[in-house]
Amino acid sequence: DLHLLSRRQRQMCIRDRTVPLLLLLHGNENDPRTQAETSGFIELCAKENFVVVELEWQGSKDYARMGMDGIEQVVYYLLKTYPQLDASRVYTEGLSAGSATSTGLGIRKSYLFAAVGGFSAGILPGSYRFDCDRQSLLGEAIQKSGAVEMPYFSATGTSDTVVPFINKDNWQKNAFFAAWQIYQIMNGMSVTERPDFSKDTIFGITLENRETIWTNKGISMETGVLSKNGVPLIQMVAVNDYGHWNFKPAAKMMWDYFMQFSRDPQTKELIYHGRK
């Protein structure tokens, strides 16, 4: 099931000729429409001029499960059907299981996406669900280490009880810490062997551009980046006292992060443009 481009999006493409493409991947057995409507990206794409496509990637009684290869084929179909789309600026993000899948896609399909991210999941240690177990992704990251770079935006709530945030007791089996480590490995960065909460009480890692951001509703977010040669290849966001769900204010943060990167469709090389 593919929720096709709206009329406004098609008209926008005709005007602009080349626009970015963002895939949204819903959570485990969620309704794709719910994911799209609560993500914050539908409102954002109308302002920022990009195309959002929500996939029924997981399958249902009516549709076969896509898997990562199927998701890749959908991207090629869209690029062929809508030549206005920019093949150098294809991104994916998701919620929960969709976030785990987007995280895995950044490693498995590193030639396809310019950046990836997600809310409320990372890489699930000890789990073999959603095509993104730690063991296989770690092997691929090690093989690609230093040769492939993939920007990664990791966001979650500090009060998530479904996929808990990192703390001093769970870090060895924590989905977010596992994802940060594996992306550090693939990106050829210094690898954090274990968190040190004396350096940062939230993330346990010393981050650049570390700040606390407040929304107009009084909710705060902690954020910072890990860089390689001045390029922010990993951005982390923790929404204080928030649970297992999308957080609309962070959508703009993710999109601004994505827009710093494109990928050459021919050479597959990552291109860093800096902040706009």
Predicted regions and their residues:
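Acidic beta-to-alpha connecting loop that harbors the catalytic carboxylate
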Residues: N28, W57, T158-T161, K168, ...
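Short substrate-entry loop that stabilizes the transition state in hydrolases
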Residues: R15-Y63, P125-G126, V162-P164
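Catalytic active-site module of serine/aspartate enzymes centered on a nucleophile-bearing elbow/loop
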Residues: P249-K276
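The feature captures the conserved acid-bearing segment of alpha/beta-hydrolase catalytic domains
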Residues: A115, A121-S220, G224-N229
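Single conserved hydrophobic/aromatic residue that forms the stacking wall/gate
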Residues: D1-R10, I14-D16
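Extracellular/periplasmic catalytic domains that process cell-envelope and extracellular macromolecules
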Residues: R15-T18, E43-E48, Q84-D86, G98, ...
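Gly/Ser-rich "nucleophile elbow"/oxyanion-hole loop immediately N-terminal to the catalytic nucleophile
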Residues: R15-V19, Y63-S102, I107-F113
